[in-house]
Structure formats: structure tokens, C-alpha cells
Amino acid sequence: MCDRNGGRRLRQWLIEQIDSSMYPGLIWENDEKTMFRIPWKHAGKQDYNQEVDASIFKAWAVFKGKFKEGDKAEPATWKTRLRCALNKSPDFEEVTDRSQLDISEPYKVYRIVPEEEQKCKLGVAPAGCMSEVPEMECGRSEIEELIKEPSVDEYMGMTKRSPSPPEACRSQILPDWWVQQPSAGLPLVTGYAAYDTHHSAFSQMVISFYYGGKLVGQATTTCLEGCRLSLSQPGLPKLYGPDGLEPVCFPTADTIPSERQRQVTRKLFGHLERGVLLHSNRKGVFVKRLCQGRVFCSGNAVVCKGRPNKLERDEVVQVFDTNQFIRELQQFYATQSRLPDSRVVLCFGEEFPDTVPLRSKLILVQVEQLYARQLVEEAGKSCGAGSLMPALEEPQPDQAFRMFPDICTSHQRPFFRENQQITV
């Protein structure tokens, strides 16, 4: 079924922004209003001003619901989103011989392609479906920019101008677990004799890998120091973390049935080589991101629920609080309220949590403290309900999903049309 609003919505929105004269540098290129200029200054330039030079890209992110005031500013990502939308929409065509990218105020020029011309290029299509472009995909450069962090030059140009998220929504930054051991003193929770310092299940983690919502591998760690989750081989402590960590590798993408999904997953792998470090103890589960690719997470210790939570590089963050989980479990037994969630979910390369179903994500890693998992299973048995925790959804055969929804706005067909439909 065609999306009648995708391409048309971008076209109408952009024309309205040009006519508003609210964005410096966003102007009509000719009197006929068939071409327009859009500012294209690199974030690493010394005179880069985020409020001015990224204003139109920010506006698109706001319009699409990808940014709201108070969120961390990511101008490079905003720019990539709009560029991808423009390049993949049949309504726009870059006029490279008019673009000026090597001047002090660089800009690109785009032409608005008339609908009749689109029909000639694509062939006759049903009315209202002209915004659909067969087999339109995000190019490799767009995918790469969306899944990795901005370059060092871009970052240095943004640090003084990018506001941080509100303090209330920032995860607590903790001392490095793999350099400095945490202090003792977590109060015990009454009523749980097993809840003590020496319970081995505190340090063990059950790690489950999901590609496109399908379980592809699982491991249970045993090392007290934690584990290194990466693509690399062990034996490189200086580059990938302390040598005493248990290596846990991502499963191969070879088993993914869809060729396109395999391609994009492997592309994402290229930015995850250094991986993340995981540590579990009686306080909870902690994570330290080392890889270039962006990693988002959810867990009961994450401050802001229901919005994307990105892990910053080289910061140790608590994502699961065992003490809080035990208190909520006590409440469950006392009042038959909702069973607390024992899971931490790491999402690689895509924003999370968001409105996109878990089954639609390229790479998800579910982490559970073995002790908390055992308590959940016992609670389920005692209530005669089996496991009360919903599993990550498996994709349904006839569902159609797309990679990077709202980014490649003109692509209205699913990439994966095999028996098992997966959005990535």
C-alpha cells in the first residue's frame, strides 16, 4: 500500500520553510521557484554556528519527532537525516553545477522535480503513489553516518555549542569499574537470604543476541570481572579493555536469511569492533561503551524512560539496579502488582527506545543478571503463570517493515520480502 504523504509531505514542508525566510541561507535560487539553496557548512569549521547553520536540519528533526528541546543536540545526525530524505525523494534532484561547497558560506542547490517528469522517469503509476520509488534504499554513506558518531573534527566544532541534556535526564557517570573497584555498603534487602555479597549469580549475566527480532545466539558469563562484548579476538587489552574480561562475540550475520539485511548488519559491525564492556555485581549491571557506533539502552536504572538513551563513549553507566529490582519484586509479592523487568536492552546503531517495535531493530542485545532472572522465573512459577516476562517479538510473515523509518522518506516498500519480514 502506498504512503500518499511521504514524499509530498517533505516537498510541501520544505517549500513552506523556504517561503518563511526564517532560515538563513535557505532561499530560492531562481525567480521561477523551481530551485533552491540550502546551507551546507561543515560542523568542524571554526565559524560554525549551530543555531544558524544547522537550523533547517534541526527543524526537520523536530518536524519528524526526532528531536525536542532539552534533547542532546546532534547537528551531524540532523543534517544526515535531511540529506538522506532529499536524495531519496523523487521530488528533489541535486544540481551539482550550481552548488558551492568550497566557499565561506557553502550551500547546495536542489531542483524541485515536476510530477510529470517523475512519471516519465518511473513510468505510469497509480494516482497518489508517485512518491513511491521501487527499490529505493539509503546509500552506504548515509547508513554509515547514521550509525556512527560524528568525526573528531565535527565533535570539536560542536562541543562549545551543543547543549547537554537536562541533568535530570542524564545517566549517572560512575568510576571506571575496570580500573577502580566500587565501594561496598549497598544495604541488603530484608527477606532475601540469598541477597548477599557472595552470591555468584550476581556476577553472572545471560546475554541474548537478536538480529531483526530473531534470537541468533545466547551466552552465560562466569567471569567475576565482567565481559567484553565485541567482534574482536581476545588478547588486545590495551585497545579493547582489560585482559581479564571474558570475551563474548557477536554471532555471525551469515545465518540472516535476507541478503540486504546481512549487508546492512555487516556494515554496522564495522563500527562495533571495540564493542562494550559489561560488569555485574550485587549493585547491578554496568556498561562502558568503547565502539565508534552509537549504542542506546534501556533498563530500570536508566533515568528517562520512553525516550532514546545513548551511551556516551568511555563512560561507565549503571543500567540495572538490583536493589530497586528487589524492592519492586517484594511489592509484586505483597500486592500482586506488575512483575519488575529484569532485562537490560542494548540497541546498536539505532535510536532506542522509540516507537519502532523491538523486532524491527538490526541488532539488539538483551542482558540479564542471572540472579534477577532466576527470581523472575521463581515468581512466575509461584503465581502459576510460567514466565511473566514478554519475550522480544518474533517478526510476523506478512508484516512489512523498512530500515530507518522516516529517514528514507520516499522508500515505501520493505527491503525484505522473504518469508520472514524484518525491519532494519
Swiss-Prot record:
GO cellular component terms listed in the entry, alphabetical order: cytoplasm; nucleoplasm; nucleus
GO molecular function (one): DNA-binding transcription factor activity
Tissue: Expressed in bone marrow macrophages (at protein level). Mainly expressed in lymphoid tissues. Predominantly expressed in CD8(+)-expressing dendritic cells.
PTM comment: Ubiquitinated. Ubiquitination by TRIM21 in macrophages, a process that is strongly increased upon interferon gamma stimulation, leds to the enhanced transcriptional activity of target cytokine genes. Ubiquitination leads to its degradation by the proteasome. Sumoylated with SUMO3. Desumoylated by SENP1.
DNA-binding region: 7-114
Disruption phenotype: Mice display an absence of interferon (IFN)-producing cells and show impaired IFN production in response to viral infection. Complete absence of plasmacytoid dendritic cells (pDCs) and conventional CD8(+)-expressing dendritic cells (cDCs). Mice display reduced autoimmunity.
Gene3D superfamilies: 2.60.200.10, Winged helix-like DNA-binding domain superfamily/Winged helix DNA-binding domain
PROSITE patterns: IRF_1, IRF_2
Alphabetic keyword roster: Activator, Autophagy, Cytoplasm, DNA-binding, Nucleus, Repressor, Transcription, Transcription regulation, Ubl conjugation
Protein task: Transcription factor that specifically binds to the upstream regulatory region of type I interferon (IFN) and IFN-inducible MHC class I genes (the interferon consensus sequence (ICS)). Can both act as a transcriptional activator or repressor. Plays a negative regulatory role in cells of the immune system.
PANTHER family membership: INTERFERON REGULATORY FACTOR, INTERFERON REGULATORY FACTOR 8
Protein name: Interferon regulatory factor 8
